């Protein structure tokens, strides 16, 4: 890493960017090239640095169920980012957008159709209602085994934001309104996944991400006491008990500052206080 040029080091931070790509190009969503349907991957053009493949999915890995290969790479059959049953209900413009993100889904004649069937584990809220960390760790073990099988390095989960309001559209992904339950469940899931060599979790969304509407621009105004007693506590538990391989900051601003740009949040609390490595 020390031998990298500044240009190569920068490439490692922006996904598998192709400067020659024409038209619609996404760095995240279903942008994986080596594993079809994976959310994204790091740049594979930097010599000596292998790519890092990331897969989304709150209830297990979300990959393209079927795909084919040709001289240009791997391509999903159907839409890699949206099930056909949901695509049928979308408007014409939305179908166009989703097809651009997920591919046209039509296999070429003569190409072999390959499969990537992943296990659907219970969603976060259901897992938390079990209060059974051993079971949650077993679910993580299932995900970790499939990560090894399909060649995925980072799972972009678990999400442990607090159930602050019933109106949040992603509450089902999150564990609980209780930060203790949230932290314990995320730690158990992480231990299960990371028992597999080369596999890691990405706990998210750090922090105070409790609404989906306008999530890239909304500003969470939270007191220090509320942050420490509610919104940060689960992350601290998870980091101390399982040391996840990655932490994803949230899109929202926190008290006027983007979370990824907050030294207090990322360095002082996450690293120095929680001990994240």
What is the predicted function of each stretch?
Residues 1-277:
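Glycoside hydrolase catalytic-domain context in secreted enzymes
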């Amino acid at each position: 890493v020390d031998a990298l040029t500044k240009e190569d080091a920068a490439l490692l931070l922006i996904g598998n960017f192709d400067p020659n790509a024409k038209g619609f190009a996404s760095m995240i969503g279903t942008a994986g090239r080596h594993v079809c349907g994976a959310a994204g991957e790091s740049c594979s053009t930097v010599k000596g640095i292998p790519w890092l493949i990331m897969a989304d999915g709150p209830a297990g890995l979300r990959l393209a169920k079927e795909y084919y290969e040709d001289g240009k790479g791997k391509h999903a059959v159907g839409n890699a980012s949206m099930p056909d049953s949901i695509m049928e209900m979308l408007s014409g413009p939305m179908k166009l957008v989703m097809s651009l993100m997920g591919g046209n889904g039509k296999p070429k004649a003569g190409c072999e159709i390959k499969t990537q069937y992943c296990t659907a584990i219970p969603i976060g809220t259901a897992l938390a209602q079990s209060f059974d960390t051993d079971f949650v760790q077993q679910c993580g073990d299932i995900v970790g085994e499939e990560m090894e099988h399909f060649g995925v390095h980072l799972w972009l989960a678990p999400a442990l934001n607090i159930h602050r309001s019933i109106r949040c559209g992603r509450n089902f992904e999150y564990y609980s309104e209780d930060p203790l339950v949230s932290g314990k469940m995320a730690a158990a899931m992480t231990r299960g996944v990371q028992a597999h060599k080369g596999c890691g979790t990405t706990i998210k969304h750090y922090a105070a991400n409790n609404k989906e509407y306008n999530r890239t621009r909304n500003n969470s105004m939270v007191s220090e006491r509320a942050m420490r007693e509610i919104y940060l506590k689960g992350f601290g538990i998870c980091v101390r008990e399982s040391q996840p391989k990655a932490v994803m900051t949230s899109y929202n601003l926190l008290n006027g500052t983007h979370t990824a740009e907050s030294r207090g949040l990322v360095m002082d609390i996450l690293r120095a206080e929680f001990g994240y490595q």
